[in-house]
Amino acid sequence: IPSAILETLSHQNFPDMRLGHDPNFKFALARAVYKSILRFMCNQHRTVATVTPLAPSYFHINYLYNGQIKLGWRETNDELEPTAKPTGYILYTAVDSAGFDNGRLVKQNEIELSLHPYSTYHFKVAAVNGGGESFTTETLSAYYQPEATNTILVVDGFDRLSSPAVIDTQQLQGFDLNEDL
């Protein structure tokens, strides 16, 4: 079985540890390792490497009328990898407390759906291509109540990942795991 040990950061080097705690750096490093392994394996088997696309972005729900909604999202372009372009999307749906279904393939970046009254619908989307399936978007939910006189909008303002707060003084260097940047 082929194996490797990847030494990427030193726990004795504070700048390295700042990177090691950064979720965005962790993702970039993991994706770079994945691409390297993929290219190596494809080269060994004389096949063309197709990199899995990045997760869609700007996922949103627009309420249209009488239980009709439109889900939409944008392709996330991987500027470093032209083969990571999605060829479609998988829309996963869960109703009330049930788990998500196996998904349905959607070729465009939007879809209109009808909601049954008094049920809570949960949606998430993944991008797909010949290389596989991306991570999913965050989960968005919708509820249709025919007697409603107003529409409620809930905005998810959480749009970033953060490392723990950095402590870097003359006396101390480290991280406050109870605070973030």
Predicted regions and their residues:
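Active-site-adjacent mobile loop/cap segments within catalytic or ligand-binding domains
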Residues: I1-H45
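Short, solvent-exposed loop/turn elements at domain surfaces
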Residues: F14-D16, P82, R160-V166
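Pro/Thr/Ser/Gly-rich low-complexity, intrinsically disordered linker/stalk tracts
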Residues: R39-T83, P117, G131-N150
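Short beta-strand elements bearing conserved aromatic residues within extracellular beta-rich modules
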Residues: T87-L91
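Short beta-strand segments within Ig-like beta-sandwich modules, predominantly Fibronectin type-III
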Residues: D101-Q108
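Exposed aromatic-hydrophobic patches
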Residues: Q108-L115, L140
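Beta-strand-rich modules
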Residues: E112-S134
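Aromatic-Pro/Gly-enriched surface loop or interdomain linker
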Residues: T137-L181
